[in-house]
Amino acid sequence: MTAIAPAIENLSLTVTEEIRVRSSLATTFAALLEEMGPSNEGHNGAPMPMTLEPWPGGRWFRDLGDNNGHLWGHVQAIKRPTLLEITGPLMMSFAVASNLQYRLKEVDSGTLITLRHTALGLFPDGYRDALAQGWPLLFDRVRRRVEQA
């Protein structure tokens, strides 16, 4: 039997997104932690609360109760209010390693949030496109939270 390995470009993923919000760095960073944690949402806006322990080595996970759940990653670096970096499989239940970086920067009109998600793994067909569509939804929730305050 002959097996053909996928090309390297089929094993990697890079998603970069930016959003500007009319809010301070500190308020925006707090909103990001809230929206990634207890106020997180899944498909179609369904509540999907997560726990994000905001310190180096802290876990980002979904607690399903009775010692069940999903580990999405660990906080690799946090520098309030300008950086949150997480490594782990995130929402993917297959052989993958991800690095997720949120960088926040003060700009004239408020705060610029830059997301960079890089991953290496055995992605099922269509998965890359689905991942790229999810991150803007989180950004929209952060924007609504800080601009309504």
Regions found by a protein language model. Give the residues of each.
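Solvent-exposed alpha-helix faces
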Residues: 33-34, 140
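Short acidic N-proximal helix/loop "leader" segments that mark the beginning
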Residues: 1-14
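Structured surface interface patches that mediate subunit assembly and partner/cofactor docking
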Residues: 11, 41-47, 51, 136-138, ...
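Hydrophobic-ligand binding "helix-grip"
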Residues: 50-52, 61, 65-108, 118-120, ...
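Short beta-edge strand/loop motif at the mouth of beta-sheet-based domains
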Residues: 16, 23, 34-71, 81-83
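A conserved amphipathic terminal alpha-helix motif
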Residues: 119-149
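Short, well-ordered beta-strand elements
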Residues: 113-117
